[in-house]
Amino acid sequence: MSQLEQKLTEMLTAPVEALGFEMVGIEFVRAGKHSTMRVYIDHPDGISVDHCAEVSHQVSAVLDVEDPINTEYNLEVSSPGMERPLFKLQHYIESVGEVVTLRLKMPMGDRRNFKGKLLSEADGMLTIEVDNQEFVLAFANIEKGNVVPTFD
């Protein structure tokens, strides 16, 4: 998570939670002049378009006052979806047993990307099985993670 994403998460978590939603995480994607801020929310009963609009309105109001971003951007509010992004250690713990993709900040040997079954978490270390080989990765070294949807 970048410093900007961390700052935005800290700034927007309370307003999102005050509306009754979980702040799953924030991605800020720079693409030339067209940056996008994605706010992922969740709720035990699911997320509707009306929920996204409500959170978008609240988040926009906070961002208009705080003005933490010095470039133009589009705001997107959505549920995490089937390819649920994993932001917090708790998200990884909840995903043990599922297939995930992980990208590391710093390579492990010559490898930076992993796709496999998340086997366990212990003291901030994640064990993932890729092609019948186990890798133990530090949560602190994970740049990005997502659940891979499986259809059984």
UniProtKB/Swiss-Prot annotation:
Q: Which InterPro entries match?
A: Ribosome_maturation_RimP (IPR003728), RimP_C (IPR028998), RimP_C_sf (IPR036847), RimP_N (IPR028989), RimP_N_sf (IPR035956)
Give an example GO biological process.
translation
The record's section on SUPFAM superfamilies has: YhbC-like, C-terminal domain, YhbC-like, N-terminal domain
Q: Name one Pfam family in it.
A: RimP_N
Entry GO CC? cytosol
Q: Where in the cell is it found?
A: Cytoplasm
Q: Does the keyword field hold Cytoplasm?
A: yes
User: Which keywords does UniProt give here?
Assistant: Cytoplasm, Ribosome biogenesis
Q: Report the sequence similarity comment from the record.
A: Belongs to the RimP family.
Q: What does this protein do?
A: Required for maturation of 30S ribosomal subunits.
Q: Which NCBIfam families match?
A: PRK00092.1-1
This chain's protein is named Ribosome maturation factor RimP
**Organism of origin:** Pseudoalteromonas atlantica (strain T6c / ATCC BAA-1087)
